Amino acid sequence: MNSKIKVDKFVIVVFLLCMVCNMTMQAKAYESFKVSIYVRAYEVDKMKDIHWLDSTWNVISQQLEVDKIYLETHRDLLVVEDATLEQAKKFFHDRGIETAGGITYTINEANSFETFCYSNPEHRKMVQKIAEHTAKHFDEFILDDFFFTSCKSDIEIKAKGMQSWTDYRLKLMTEAGRDLVLKPAKKVNPQVKVIIKYPNWYESYRQCG
């Protein structure tokens, strides 16, 4: 691929699904694998401009045959609007591309990956609303690696008590995944499938739940 082609505007993360047995490209598709891409909320939000979406996608689709695209609905407190999500879905469906949702539960990624505080009532409400918002638009969505917490607010310290941070956060994130994400999403859309992609960068991430 020509390194000069600017695809970083879309900031895509490419997942190769299935085992890659044959890397030979075909005119219309690939024989031995499918390709999915993940688009951050920042770029999904830009899809409100159909001309931006069309021109950007033309660059990408000339270089890569895409089967599925994950459209992120939230990152860093940016929630993509309903109309933008529906327009983006239609754009890709019209081109034969499957769509799914994605969520990154961060407050401010640039601030040392600032996460939600999952014992904070206001944060819990936001987490649930984001899950419901996403389930309304998609029958499948994936939680990005940032579904963890490093929060040490007064609320969290009090809730932790005498537990270790690891034990406390493991229980907290299990409860949050079940009661703030899965159950509310299923209530909005009984058919929805939620994929939790647990952080796998370092073994120490278990300390963040």
Where are these regions (language model features)?
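Position-driven detector of the extreme protein N-terminus
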Residues: 2, 20, 24-26
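Bacterial N-terminal signal peptides that target proteins for export
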Residues: 2-12
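Bacterial N-terminal signal peptides
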Residues: 11-22
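Glycan-processing catalytic domains of CAZymes
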Residues: 27-209
